[in-house]
Amino acid sequence: MHVGVLGGTFDPPHNGHLALALFARELLCVDRLILSVSDNPLKQRRSASDSQRKAMTELLCHEINRTGTFCDACGWELEQKRPSYTVNLLRFVRSLYPSARLSLLVGEDSWRNFGSWKSPEEIEELADVVVFARGAEHMTERPDAVSGIRFVEFSCPLSSTMLRGRIAEGQSVSSLLPSSIDRYIRREGLYGE
């Protein structure tokens, strides 16, 4: 079994996350994808609560799973009493899937700081690291010294920050996220001024 792990604040989850999940399933041959909702240490005024972010991530998984069970939302990081690091998350996932092949899915922006992450060597021992690069022109700028890191081109102009800003300005984002998440955001009154 091949298990992919994608961590993030998912504040809110959007169609870029949906596309990345489907990409992982179809092109990386991931059998199970864990979307781990992480703590947001830089909480801003217009951020959703932990429980709201987890609920929206569960809605995203429901959308992804319409074509077969594949994706699970995980709140393990939110339940920790101390800061959780990627290496801790991977140890937890390894305990759930002791014989599975693990792949950590990260965006290029996050990967650029990989050397400063806690225990990067152990991360590479626990999982293959797959970096989603923003495009071929950016992939040529990446450091090549890191072995065992796989780069794949995946360009998505969406960001949760952009969506929160648009919602705060009263703009519609209904075409940029699954309809169930759009309804949830409106029902809960999230990200408004």
Curated annotation (Swiss-Prot):
Q: In which pathway does it act?
A: Cofactor biosynthesis; NAD(+) biosynthesis; deamido-NAD(+) from nicotinate D-ribonucleotide: step 1/1
Q: Which CDD domains match?
A: NMNAT (cd02165)
Q: Indicate whether Metal-binding appears among the record's keywords.
A: no
Q: Which reaction does it catalyse?
A: nicotinate beta-D-ribonucleotide + ATP + H(+) = deamido-NAD(+) + diphosphate
Q: Where is the signal peptide?
A: none
Sample GO molecular function, one term: nicotinate-nucleotide adenylyltransferase activity
Choose any GO biological process term that the UniProt entry carries and state it: NAD biosynthetic process
Q: Which Gene3D superfamilies match?
A: HUPs (3.40.50.620)
Top EC class of this enzyme: transferase
Per UniProt, the keywords (alphabetical) are: ATP-binding, NAD, Nucleotide-binding, Nucleotidyltransferase, Pyridine nucleotide biosynthesis, Transferase
Query: What HAMAP family does the database record attribute to this sequence?
Result: NaMN_adenylyltr
Chain's role: Catalyzes the reversible adenylation of nicotinate mononucleotide (NaMN) to nicotinic acid adenine dinucleotide (NaAD).
What is the protein name given in its UniProt record?
Probable nicotinate-nucleotide adenylyltransferase
Q: What is the lineage of its organism?
A: Bacteria, Pseudomonadati, Chlorobiota, Chlorobiia, Chlorobiales
- The gene behind this protein is nadD
